[in-house]
């Protein structure tokens, strides 16, 4: 089953170098940490927000560039054993769009149901 969510906001914390993509009106149930990428799960077992710690190093960008995110998308594939996360982001750097990607894999330690989910943000 494929579920799509449109997040409406993002916050970049320059000092702590973390990005938080959010905006869903779902009710929060729990979080899972995939080695510094935190997925917030709603009561419906769908991903409702993503926080990326140490973001500038993970995306190989300057911190200043992360203040100019123009597009973000994430594909989350949940299997019985694992959660695989594939992210793409575009930032405006010197009046030019620069595309970056990031993948993460972790255990499905909270037994989320098998699904494929997508999150997208246009700024």
From Swiss-Prot:
Q: What is its EC number?
A: 2.-.-.-
GO MF, one example: transferase activity
Q: Which InterPro entries match?
A: DUF2283 (IPR019270)
Tell me one GO biological process term. Answer: purine ribonucleoside salvage
Q: What are the UniProt keywords, alphabetically? A: Purine salvage, Transferase
Which Pfam families does the UniProt record give?
Answer: DUF2283
| Traits of the deletion mutant | Cells have increased resistance to the purine analog 8-aza-2,6-diaminopurine (8-ADP).
Asked whether the keyword ATP-binding is assigned, the reply is no
Q: Provide the top EC class.
A: transferase
TM annotation in the entry: none
Q: What does this protein do?
A: May play a role in purine salvage.
Q: Would you tell me the protein name for this molecule?
A: Putative hypoxanthine phosphoribosyltransferase
Q: Which organism is it from?
A: Methanosarcina mazei (strain ATCC BAA-159 / DSM 3647 / Goe1 / Go1 / JCM 11833 / OCM 88)
